[in-house]
Every structure is written in C-alpha cells, then in structure tokens.
Amino acid sequence: MENTAASNSRPRLAGLKVLVIDDSKTIRRTAETLLSKEGCEVYTAVDGFDALSKIADHQPDIVFVDIMMPRLDGYQTCSLIKHNKVFRSIPVIMLSSKDGLFDRARGRIVGSEHYLTKPFTKEELLGAIETHIVR
C-alpha cells in the first residue's frame, strides 16, 4: 500500500496565504515556522494597524489574531475585517492566553470563526486551517 503523504512531495498547504497578528515575537515566529513547513506563505503583523495594511497588500486566505495587543486589539481588528466588504469572507481565528466563555463569545460577536488558546499545538493550528479553508 502506498503512503500518500510520502508520495506527495508538495506540502499539503502549499501556497496558502496566512496572516499571523500578535505582539509576541515568540508566537509570531512559532506560527510562522510551523506554517512555513506546511508550505504556507506566512505574513506577520505586530498589531491591528500593521495587519490592516498587510491584509490589503497580501489578501490572506486566513488570519490568526491575538486578542490582547496594543493600539488596536484583536476584537477591533476582527470587527474591521468583517465589516469590510472585500475582506469579510476571510476566516479569522482568535488567539488568546485566556480560555474564558466571555472571551470566546466576544470573539464570535465580532465575527471570528474559531478560537485557539495559547500556547497552541501544531495540530490545533493546522486543524483550524483545515476546518475553515476549502481547498
């Protein structure tokens, strides 16, 4: 029996454009490393303002955004994405060190599709992508 993963030399998420927004360099680098190994084109931003220009420039397929950031937090960033007619269809995954019901509900209210608690695993990160991206 042939191992399809081994026989397919192209990474499973090749060419998928992902934006990771987090004020933590460690989180940005971790996500970038994990996703790049899967073939994703990864863009990073340090806050919501930085992210908005990168969304316009790169038009990512999916966005991961930290909730607690300076200047423009994750809720505000998600809301701005979801209220823009050009970008509203981009799935937004909230990232937080908090795992409270209120935080999850507030994320849903502003339009996020999913919520991951930090620190996240490779499987959680890839699972969120596979759940929300139809390829």
Where are the regions a protein language model picked out?
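Short hydrophobic/Thr-rich beta-strand motif most characteristic of the beta2 strand and flanking loop
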Residues: G39-V46, K54
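Active-site beta3 strand of CheY-like receiver
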Residues: H58-F64
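Non-catalytic signal-transmission and effector/linker regions of two-component phosphorelay proteins
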Residues: M1-K17, E123-R135
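Charged docking surfaces used in two-component/phosphorelay signaling
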Residues: R29-K37
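Receiver (REC) domain active-site loop signature in two-component systems and cognate sites
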Residues: M69
